[in-house]
Amino acid sequence: MFDVTLLILLGLAALGFISHNTTVAVSILVLIIVRVTPLNTFFPWIEKQGLTVGIIILTIGVMAPIASGTLPPSTLIHSFVNWKSLVAIAVGVFVSWLGGRGITLMGNQPQLVAGLLVGTVLGVALFRGVRSAH
């Protein structure tokens, strides 16, 4: 039996490797493993809770330098007076707002989910939108 979905996932994983984006490649390979093993029974949970769990992990990673003391309070306070930091804050707010609209769009217009997901993966892979630290 020819599995088109598996072929698409393999292609996207290859794109992740070709673009040296291990975040995309590893994420898709994990999903492939889930798909081809008995773990596939977890897909409903992954689909329902995966985004929330991912955002929690992302937030932990972003906040870790503050919690560990690596980012001193003086640097954090300075970010509110430096123009580059203020621009970074504004961009962060805008990106968060866009992300929220994308999640709402996915819920309200499910027919757009496939295009939005493929576009996100391609954007990350080709334009290095999210990269793991080396």
From Swiss-Prot:
Transmembrane segments: 14-34, 51-71, 86-106, 110-130
Entry annotated with the keyword DNA-binding: no
Keywords of the record: Cell membrane, Membrane, Transmembrane, Transmembrane helix
Species name: Salmonella typhimurium (strain LT2 / SGSC1412 / ATCC 700720)
Family: Belongs to the UPF0756 family.
Subcellular location per the Swiss-Prot or TrEMBL entry: Cell membrane
Protein name: UPF0756 membrane protein YeaL
Membrane disposition: Multi-pass membrane protein
Pfam families, per the entry: DUF441 (PF04284)
Annotated InterPro entries: UPF0756_TM
GO cellular component, one term: plasma membrane
Main localization, broad class: membrane
Domain of life: Bacteria
